[in-house]
């Protein structure tokens, strides 16, 4: 399941580095970190709204937007996707059998 997310991460990183003409990711980079953060916030709100009142396919669509914009934001902040996965794994190990937060 996470193989595609790893591939997407690599594509996002490449587009950030190369900034190809016509790339949406490159456009976000050009507009800067505050823009990327706002886009992530907007997409998060859209997911919340969809979760509460829209059909299932809308929730899936908005969730994909949130994941993409999260990855772009992380990349712009210099946080590697593998670090986030590692943190989730750490939490899972720390909480296994203890009730946890997940």
Swiss-Prot record:
First-level EC class: hydrolase
One GO biological process from the UniProt record?
A: L-histidine biosynthetic process
What would you give as a GO molecular function for this chain, any one?
ATP binding
Pfam families attached to this UniProt entry: PRA-PH
- CC terms in the record's Gene Ontology section: cytoplasm
- In which domain of life is the source organism classified? Archaea
Keyword Transmembrane annotated: no
Q: Supply the SUPFAM superfamilies for this chain.
A: all-alpha NTP pyrophosphatases (SSF101386)
Reactions it catalyzes: 1-(5-phospho-beta-D-ribosyl)-ATP + H2O = 1-(5-phospho-beta-D-ribosyl)-5'-AMP + diphosphate + H(+)
Q: In which pathway does it act?
A: Amino-acid biosynthesis; L-histidine biosynthesis; L-histidine from 5-phospho-alpha-D-ribose 1-diphosphate: step 2/9
**Which compartments does it reside in?**
Cytoplasm
Q: What is its EC number?
A: 3.6.1.31
Keywords in alphabetical order: Amino-acid biosynthesis, ATP-binding, Cytoplasm, Histidine biosynthesis, Hydrolase, Nucleotide-binding
Record PANTHER family: HISTIDINE BIOSYNTHESIS BIFUNCTIONAL PROTEIN (PTHR42945), HISTIDINE BIOSYNTHESIS BIFUNCTIONAL PROTEIN HIS7 (PTHR42945:SF1)
Q: According to its UniProt record, which protein family does this protein belong to? A: Belongs to the PRA-PH family.
Specify the protein name: Phosphoribosyl-ATP pyrophosphatase
Q: Which organism is it from?
A: Ignicoccus hospitalis (strain KIN4/I / DSM 18386 / JCM 14125)
């Amino acid at each position: 399941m996470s193989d595609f997310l790893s591939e997407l991460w690599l594509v996002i990183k490449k587009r950030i580095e190369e900034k190809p003409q016509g790339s949406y990711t490159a456009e976000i980079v050009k507009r800067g970190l505050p823009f990327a953060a706002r886009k992530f916030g907007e997409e998060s709100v859209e997911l919340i709204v969809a979760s509460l009142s829209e059909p299932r396919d809308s929730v899936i669509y908005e969730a994909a937007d949130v994941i993409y914009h999260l990855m772009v934001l992380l990349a712009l902040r210099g946080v590697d996707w593998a670090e986030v996965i590692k943190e989730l794994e750490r939490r899972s190990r720390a909480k296994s059998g203890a009730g946890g937060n997940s």
